[in-house]
């Protein structure tokens, strides 16, 4: 099924036409495997997070049949405990461990698809998948509210990653929105997301330090745990460390390497706090990575002008499509990363040691 009306496909004047957006989505769909999996590139591996990101982009661009096939892959490959393997290639599991963020992201993708299509039957089909996934993830929450990054057969890896937890925070809020839609209250999720949001906003010491990475910088804003002045201050504090004028943003602060997906995620974070001028600037800046077929190179080493790695990743194009939708306000899902109508859980309605110690 193809939604034919290009008026319903995002475009950003002067940067991207709806036809180009659809072309990028088709490049993603062309990599899809018969199982519905959306790998990094044709013949590459699939991970559950980027797979869902790709499905969201297909939904935005009106390629609903491959999007549904992708969500069906999520449903049929989910394990009984609610998880997915970290990495699969051509149907063969290459890493059987479970990443909490990878497992949670299905909630964001499903809610996004429901927002755009209004398809209640799809919601009913995917609700058990989302519920099992979020229960699995919340079971990995540590005493401070942060969520362990992975689980193996031998148990939890009891380290929490800020980027992953910020994304999980957003995914649980999407799961709560879906729960409301389905009439299925989830009080445990409300408590868990409140504790997680507090940890992200107030307890940086709870997370493994990865300050070199740009995702650590913008993800607390993108995920919605930080808003208002705290979010603006965080973005401004390290702007010059990561932003390369005219090219996008560095993946890490000490390498001359800009990456398209990170730049588009920054666009989403900027859009979420109303910094639209800089959001549009960064969106335009990353388009040097576009190829004639609508695909996008992952990044550029700008001191020698070489593409690196030598791959055009589906999820780079997907991040671009989601950013285009946010900036253009095109589909009914365009506000998902602004947190439009997403529940915030029980924020401030529980006792943290940092609060009780001040009483």
Curated annotation (Swiss-Prot):
An MF annotation (GO) of this entry: hydrolase activity
Temperature dependence: Optimum temperature is 45 degrees Celsius.
Keyword terms of this UniProt record: Carbohydrate metabolism, Hydrolase
Ranges in a coiled coil: none
Function: Hydrolase involved in the biosynthesis of 3-O-methylmannose polysaccharides (MMP), which are intracellular polymethylated polysaccharides implicated in the modulation of fatty acid metabolism in non-tuberculous mycobacteria. Highly specific hydrolase that catalyzes the internal cleavage of MMP. Is able to hydrolyze purified MMP into distinct lower order oligomannosides but does not cleave acylated or deacylated forms of 6-O-methylglucose lipopolysaccharide (MGLP), beta-mannans, synthetic 4alpha-oligomannosides or its own reaction products.
Catalytic activity: Endohydrolysis of 3-O-methyl-alpha-D-mannosyl-(1->4)-3-O-methyl-D-mannose linkages within (1,4)-3-O-methyl-alpha-D-mannnan substrates
The keyword Cytoplasm is assigned to this record: no
EC main group: hydrolase
pH dependence: Optimum pH is 6.5.
InterPro entries noted in UniProt: 6-hairpin_glycosidase_sf (IPR008928), 6hp_glycosidase-like_sf (IPR012341)
Signal peptide start-end: none
Organism: Mycolicibacterium hassiacum (strain DSM 44199 / CIP 105218 / JCM 12690 / 3849)
Gene that encodes it: mmpH
Keyword Hydrolase: yes
A biological process term (GO) from this entry: carbohydrate metabolic process
UniProt-listed Enzyme Commission number(s): 3.2.1.221
SUBUNIT field: Monomer in solution.
Effect annotated for changing residue 50 to A: Strong decrease in activity
Protein name per its UniProtKB record: MMP endo-(1,4)-3-O-methyl-alpha-D-mannosidase
């Amino acid at each position: 099924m193809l939604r034919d009306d290009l008026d319903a496909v995002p475009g950003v004047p002067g940067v991207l036409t709806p036809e180009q957006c659809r072309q990028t989505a088709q490049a993603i769909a062309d990599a899809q495997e018969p199982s519905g999996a959306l790998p990094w590139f044709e013949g590459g591996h699939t991970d559950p997070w980027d797979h869902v990101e790709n499905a969201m982009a297909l939904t935005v661009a009106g390629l609903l049949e491959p999007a549904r096939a992708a969500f069906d892959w999520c449903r049929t490959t989910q394990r009984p405990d609610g998880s997915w393997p970290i990495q699969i290639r051509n149907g063969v599991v290459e890493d059987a461990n479970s990443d909490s963020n990878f497992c949670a992201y299905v909630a964001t993708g499903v809610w996004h698809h429901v927002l755009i299509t209004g398809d209640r039957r799809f919601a009913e089909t995917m609700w058990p998948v989302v519920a099992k996934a979020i229960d699995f993830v919340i079971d990995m929450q540590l005493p401070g509210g942060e969520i362990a990054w992975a689980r193996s057969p031998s148990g939890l890896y009891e380290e929490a990653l800020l980027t992953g937890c910020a994304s999980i925070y957003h995914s649980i809020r999407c799961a709560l929105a879906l729960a409301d839609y389905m009439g299925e209250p989830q009080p445990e999720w409300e408590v868990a997301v409140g504790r997680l949001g507090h940890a992200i906003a107030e307890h940086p010491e709870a997370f493994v330090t990865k300050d070199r990475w740009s995702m650590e910088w913008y993800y607390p804003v993108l995920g919605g745990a930080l808003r208002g002045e705290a979010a603006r201050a965080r973005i401004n504090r390290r702007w010059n460390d990561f932003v390369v004028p005219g090219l996008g943003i560095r993946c890490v602060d000490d390498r001359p390497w800009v990456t398209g997906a990170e730049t588009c995620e920054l666009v989403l974070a900027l859009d979420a706090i109303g910094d639209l001028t800089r959001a549009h600037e960064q969106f335009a800046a990353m388009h040097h990575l576009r190829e004639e077929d609508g695909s996008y190179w992952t990044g550029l080493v700008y001191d020698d002008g070489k593409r690196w790695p030598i791959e055009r990743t589906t999820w780079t194009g997907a991040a671009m499509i989601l950013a285009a939708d946010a900036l253009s306000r095109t589909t009914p899902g365009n506000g998902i990363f602004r947190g439009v109508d997403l529940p915030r859980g029980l924020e401030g309605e529980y006792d943290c040691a940092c609060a009780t110690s001040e009483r």
